Amino acid sequence: MSEPQRLKPVFPQDPKWPGEGSSRVPFWAYTREDLYKRELERLFYANHWCYVGLEAEIPNPGDFKRTVIGERSVIMVRDPDGGINVVENVCAHRGMRFCRERHGNAKDFFCPYHQWNYSLKGDLQGVPFRRGVKQDGKVNGGMPKDFKLEEHGLTKLKVAARGGAVFASFDHDVEPFEEFLGPTILHYFDRVFNGRKLKILGYRRQRIPGNWKLMQENIKDPYHPGLLHTWFSTFGLWRADNKSELKMDAKFRHAAMISTRGQGGKNEEVVSGVDSFKEQMKVNDPRLLDIVPEPWWGGPTAVMTTIFPSVIIQQQVNSVSTRHIQPNGHGSFDFVWTHFGFEDDNEEWTQRRLIQANLFGPAGFVSADDGEVIEWSQEGFEQKPTHRTVIEMGGHEIGDTDHMVTETLIRGMYDYWRKVMGE
C-alpha cells in the first residue's frame, strides 16, 4: 500500500518559486500583498515608462487629464507654451490629492485645503500668508525666511510623447522610450501612432476583481481567444487557423500578437468540440462586421500590443483603442479603454469604428468574457496560494512564433518578472 501524500500548507509562510523557468507560476504571485507592493516599486515607479494618455485628450493650453501610474494619482496637462507635463496629484504642503476632476481646463492648480497654488508645469507660485499677517503693529506667522518656493513644487515626472501617445516615469534615469520598447515593438507602436492626428471617440471603464498581471497575460495569450470567445471563433476574427505571428522585445516584457482574419465558418481542425463555435449564429446588424482594410495596417487585420506593465494598444479590424491597466491592490484593477479614430476620418469611418467598438469593453461581445475568467481565476488563486498554473502550451521555450497555439508570450513575461522581482 502506498504512503498517503503529505498535505502541503495552503498558505505557506516562506513560499518558493516552483523550480527553474517560467512555465509554472505559483498562485501566490497573484495573492501576496507584500509582493504587490514590490511590483509597484519596481515595475510602476522605477525603471519603466507607463502610459498616461493621448495628446488628443489635452489639445488646448490648460487642458488636463487626471489618471494614475500604479496607485499614484498623476495629472497630464498642456502648459501655455504647448508642452505636455505630468505631475503628481499630491500637494507639496500637506499631501492632499487636490485635483478631483477627471478632465478639465485650468489656468493653474491649487489645493483647496490651504490654497497653495501651482503653475501648469508644477512649480509652486503662491502660498497664502507666506509673509505673515500684520496685526497691532507686528507680523504674526508666516513661513520661515529660508522657505523657497522653488523647493516645494509638485513632483514632476519624465515625459515621452510619440505619435500622439504620452508615457511618463517617476524615474528620471529611465532609459529612452524608444530603447524601452525596442525596435520590434516600436515598429508596431508606430504602426498605430504614425503621426496622424487622433480623434477621441469615447471611454469605457470597469473594475475587475483580479490581479493586474492577469490582463497582461490575457492579451499575451493567443491560446484562448478561439476557445473562449464566440465572436472570434464563429466569425474568424481571431482563432487558431488565422495567419499569425507572435513577437517580443529582447527582454520578453513587451509583445505583439499579429493576426490576419480568416473566413470563419466550420474548420473541423479548430472548431470541433469547441463550445464557443456557434455555426448558426448570424449578426442582426451587419455593420458590426463591416470591415474595410486600411492602408496603414500593412496586411494584418489585428495587432494587440502589450507594453509592460501598464497598457495594451488594440487594433482589432477598424476599432482602435488603448487599454490602461490601473492596479488597485493585489486582487483588483481598473481597466480604462480610450477609443479613438483619426482626425481625417469622415463620419462614415467614425461610425464604423464606434460600431465595431461594441465587441469590446465591459459589456462587449468579446471582452465581457475576459473580465469574468479573470475574476474566477483570482478566486481560485485565493483559495489555495500554494498551487501553481501550467503555462506549457508550445513547450517550455521562449521565443517568437508564426502560430498561435502557444503560451510563449506569458512565459516570456514571467521570465522578465522573475528577474526584476528577484523571485
From Swiss-Prot:
Disruption phenotype: Cells lacking this gene are not able to convert salicylate to gentisate. One of its GO terms (cellular component) is catalytic complex. Its EC number is 1.14.13.172. Belongs to the bacterial ring-hydroxylating dioxygenase alpha subunit family. [2Fe-2S] cluster binds at residues 91, 93, 111, 114. One of its GO terms (molecular function) is 2 iron, 2 sulfur cluster binding. It comes from Ralstonia sp. SUPFAM superfamilies: Bet v1-like, ISP domain. Residues 1-20 are annotated as: Disordered. The keyword Oxidoreductase applies. The keyword Isomerase does not apply. Oxygenase component of the salicylate 5-hydroxylase (S5H) multicomponent enzyme system which catalyzes the 5-hydroxylation of salicylate to gentisate. Active only on substrates with a ring-substituted carboxylate group with an adjacent hydroxyl group. Primarily active against salicylate and substituted salicylates, but not against 2-hydroxycinnamate, 3-hydroxycinnamate, 2-hydroxyphenylacetate, 3-hydroxyphenylacetate, 2-hydroxybenzophenone, 1-hydroxy-2-naphthoate, 4-methoxysalicylate or 2-hydroxyacetophenone. Binds 1 Fe cation per subunit. Keywords: 2Fe-2S, Aromatic hydrocarbons catabolism, Iron, Iron-sulfur, Metal-binding, Monooxygenase, NAD, Oxidoreductase, Plasmid. It catalyses: salicylate + NADH + O2 + H(+) = 2,5-dihydroxybenzoate + NAD(+) + H2O. InterPro entries: AhdA1c-like_alpha_C, Rieske_2Fe-2S, Rieske_2Fe-2S_sf, Ring-hydroxy_dOase_2Fe2S_BS, Ring_hydroxy_dOase_asu_C_dom, Rng_hydr_dOase-A. Fe cation binds at residues 224, 229, 370. The gene is nagG. It comes from the Bacteria. Residues 49-168 form the Rieske domain. This is Salicylate 5-hydroxylase, large oxygenase component. One of its GO terms (biological process) is salicylic acid catabolic process. Its cofactor is Fe cation; [2Fe-2S] cluster. It is an enzyme of class 1 (oxidoreductase). The salicylate 5-hydroxylase (S5H) multicomponent enzyme system is composed of an electron transfer component and an oxygenase component. The electron transfer component is comprised of a ferredoxin reductase (NagAa) and a ferredoxin (NagAb), and the oxygenase component is formed by a large subunit (NagG) and a small subunit (NagH). Pathway: Aromatic compound metabolism; naphthalene degradation.
